[in-house]
Amino acid sequence: THLASLYHDDVMDSAPTRRGVPSAQHLWGNNRAILAGDILFARASLLVASLGPEMVAHHARTFERLCEGQLNETFGPTDGADRVDFYLQVLADKTGSLVSTAASFGALLSGAGSLMAGIVADFGEKVGVAFQIADDVLDLASSGQQSGKTPGTDLREGVDTLPVLLLRRREAAGTIDEAGA
């Protein structure tokens, strides 16, 4: 599911590279990259189906959250919404849900029980959000050789990430000095 979501994300972001190599959409075009992502989603679903109906439902809810997060990111926050809270919810839905599900699957399949699965799911979501924040900082602060991606992709695509949102918040409050710090 994660790899499939990356194929789709690269189409949405018009990203030419992923992990230091040309992205699927760059190599094959948008239509083929989307279809390849769909095939990967289907294969992941087949694997999860062998785990039983409870896991299939959990996987489906994760896929739904992932898509809702992408839609919300695409549409942006409603008027008056806190943009940082909105951003963090998008991260929780897109990246956090995937890590959360992987963690809860591990707990459930190891026999740890639903209480422990819930605890590791919550932790996994936080890890996913933290990972995405770090990735967003790298998009601004690292070279393509370091990150394996084209720097500044989010800025070019008009996606407000946490560093940009916090800078705008400071600008609105008048707390940025002449050097921009």
What does each model-identified segment do?
Residues 1-177:
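Mg2+-dependent prenyl diphosphate-binding active-site environment of isoprenoid biosynthetic enzymes
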